[in-house]
Design a protein with these regions (language model features):
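Short polar/charged helix/loop
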Residues: 1-163
Length: 163
């Protein structure tokens, strides 16, 4: 479960890209990839058009769901999810407040899987935040998708070892 603020930019981009990488590895039928937000401020909105644009430009156009419905993570989603991938330290803190204690070990920041990034000190997880493209333009969305694509293979490798 990829998690961002409103479930219209980073988390749906992560969902689409991770699903693509799992399918490429032949694991698509064993892994269910979803996305959600920690806020309901964008409730019912589609994926941000700027995110859709960069996804199409990168070749994911056929994989963009037409029925995306931005939402805050639900109790049912929490119960059925084995891995939570918040995009930022702020998302991680908000998510941890929502989770029962038995689920907290299943929370790993998205970029924490990148072996090329230094492991942040406790309390400084924001050092590996995925860039927030919301207030930016095309460049910020390209940086965000670069960061998501860069880490996706490492997440897929890690999950494959857990299966």
């Amino acid at each position: 479960m990829t998690v961002c603020t409103g479930n219209i930019c980073r988390s749906p981009m992560g969902e689409i890209i991770l699903r693509h990488f799992f399918n490429e590895r032949g694991l698509g039928d064993q892994v269910n990839v979803e996305s959600s937000g920690v806020s309901d401020e964008e409730w019912s909105h589609p994926i941000d058009p700027r995110a859709v644009r960069v996804l199409r430009e990168r070749g994911y156009g056929d994989e963009i769901p037409r029925d995306h419905f931005a939402h805050r993570i639900s109790r049912e989603e929490i119960d059925r999810t084995d891995l939570f991938l918040p995009m930022t330290a702020s998302h991680m803190r908000a998510l941890l407040r929502m989770l029962p204690s038995g689920k907290r070990a299943e929370v790993h920041m998205y970029r924490s899987f990148d072996p090329n990034l230094p492991k942040p000190k406790p309390g400084r997880e924001d050092q590996i935040d995925l860039v927030d493209p919301w207030y930016g333009g095309k460049h910020e969305f390209e940086v965000a998708i670069d960061q998501i694509e860069e880490v996706a293979p490492y997440i897929v490798d890690w999950v494959a070892k857990q299966l």
